[in-house]
């Protein structure tokens, strides 16, 4: 045979064989419907598979779904532990680098793979797989196909937990539940990593299956009694051999026990599982969670985003943060919600906070932002998936959702770090869900109040700054310049607005993450104008500051510089001796500089306590420049930003003479403004539904009320710091504060260690040293006192009393009271608003410990509110407060404090008398009217017979600048109390005059009328 003859024969034989293959393909059943595939298979395919397989494969290819165009089939291999997997597709063939890890995570060992091309653009890949144990293809094929599709489309994850597919009957969706709960366990602070959690589940497949069985029994609609399933789960857990595995699995058990709702059974518009899992827990029922535990917690999980939302109560509000703390963002959110609970003591909702992470953020900036928005949308949808709706005033629960809790329709969100521009996105999703709150769901959107435009947060914090300066005898708005160090830049809301609020600001230095601005001897007028220019300039930085306006020795320096030369002017202004410093050290020196004010409007924690470590602070980016509270030499700190100091750092600074409050006190204006916006929109939605108002008119009305809303908000920013000033002036109240804390602890409302409040032994030392609590400590206790009173009022029928419901008109702007007051009583939160208004009014005026003292006297906090209301109205206290506060910068601030305390003492004596004589609050209007008339008559008699009361007090106050009429009214308060007490003690009207004459004689003998 000639050379080359054999190959010719082989080719001929192969062509003959292929022709036979095509003929046999055409003769098979259904071949007519598959005609396009008759010649589509490659030579390699025809060599490997008979025509009958070609028909079956062609049918599979023809039936490929549009998205993704994938399918798979399983067949037995050469032995019981081997399977043949065919993967079908269209377009670009599947990458082995993606397929192999997917299969290996499921538990397969891939022995070989053979690809085949099929015209025009189909492909097939055959994998030879071995298994740890024998398994029938039909037992796993459909679950494997579903898993492959969902992993391929990024609808679920590919990791070791998917090995449960082969050793249990769980499907990929059920495994996703275990994965999501496992990731929550890590965020909850359990001492396990994800590898340990996967190992525990994979090593105990029966327990894993029992977990899912219990999940279905409890949460599947129409599932019935879950008792048996949980009993079986307990049995399975007792059989686990490894102590670590059992501990991990018991975390799962605890989560299922505390689980209230899930969206697992909900479907999207196409009838498919949703692209996220959401779980709502009764957090206080999860033993392993760190304190403080919120009331409710929602965990949202998907392959692209993880998020958590913590709520302190059923009516709660707070921002959603785009976190960069992937490993422990729940810890970050827990710290924020603790602060939010304290901050929200002045508003209707209690505190909530949410946070989410983008799990695989792209490097490109624009793509990064789009990924963040997409993850935010998923997070918001996960929250709304588990939230009840209101339709025509009736609760409508989420579809296909078992609820193990009460109706829960109130969910509002706000902006936070990273989500400042996302409110409209949230409201669009609320509209998609037809959520009852509409665009009140996320405040600050395009039809809401622009916090930066109003400057509400900075203006609120500035009320604290002005008060601190008044107590130092300075009027910074009119006469007195002051030096300041700033944290932030002029493009920021809080920093920028704050540095425009006084023409007397001498900003010596400021820093942000990019620059250090130094102006050792600024001209107040010129620098104010330049700061205003930067504030108006989009995306400005300190580098945009006109260098010609910076004083000698100053400049703008990059934080990336190796060192910064210290000019003589800088040395003098900031008490620096070195000739040069690294940027981080220069910032530390600025924070320690002897200035009047540190104004914090930035992000980061810059001051801690000397006994705290940087790791405890949890802000690694600022470790190099952070200082201790005892090293602060500024006279005042204004906390426009959040978390600028640790609480222990605040306390240490206060104990070393720095005047400050807390961030929750200073910057509460933002959350208060948002709450007003939400409640106004809820009110006006009623008018819209009644046809009295359309959306355009509502938006116009919202804009018209901007100044009025700001005025309402700033009122609390004035009153709360005033309450702290009064508390600091009364050191003798320390025992009352101690007993209040003990009471709150007894009711499991307060954990002193968490809130950095002193224990009884520490309080004893302060008492011996004649020390008080510091302002930061009092600020926390103020919030807890308000929360305690609020809860008692809300649980009573007091908010429904007609007299107290009149306070709704005080809460809302006057424009609403004039035209839409009829909707106030039917407002969804009318009881909460009334309780909040009463709580703020009473605690701000009577002080932090008033609630405890009243509870000891009568044990009835609602009765305290009624008696306080009677005392306030019969004393005309509101007018007196207004006149005292009008004396700001006219008389010494210490005199104002003295007068406020005199008025408070009068009210407390009156309340005690009303309680002692059992005065009812059933008809407040009649009681107040009757007492007012009688008191007026008795005072008229006294003045006619005896003249003015306490003339020496009146004269002393006038000498300090107090108006004569106000001095006279305040001097008459003791006589006014005696009139009230005489009326209450009188047996009847006939004896009242005689009793009053006896009282006047006694008072004259005591020098009342000298």
Report the location of each language-model feature.
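Non-catalytic interaction/regulatory segments
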Residues: 1-108, 112-304, 316-323, 367-371, ...
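Generic recognition of flexible, low-complexity loop/linker segments
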Residues: 69-76, 86-88, 98-100, 116, ...
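Non-transmembrane, aqueous-exposed alpha-helical and coiled segments at domain scale
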Residues: 362-363, 372-377, 384-406, 419-1010
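Extended active-site and interfacial segments that coordinate phosphate-rich ligands
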Residues: 4-6, 10, 105-110, 114, ...
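Short glycine-rich or small-residue beta-strand-to-loop segments that form or flank ligand, phosphate
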Residues: 1-2, 84-88, 165-166, 179-183, ...
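Short coil/turn segments at secondary-structure boundaries
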Residues: 159-165, 177, 190-199, 225-228, ...
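Hydrophobic/aromatic-rich, well-ordered segments within soluble, folded domains that form packed cores
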Residues: 95-104, 108, 175-184, 340-356, ...
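Long, K/E/R/D-enriched contiguous segments that form extended
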Residues: 33-36, 227, 231, 235, ...
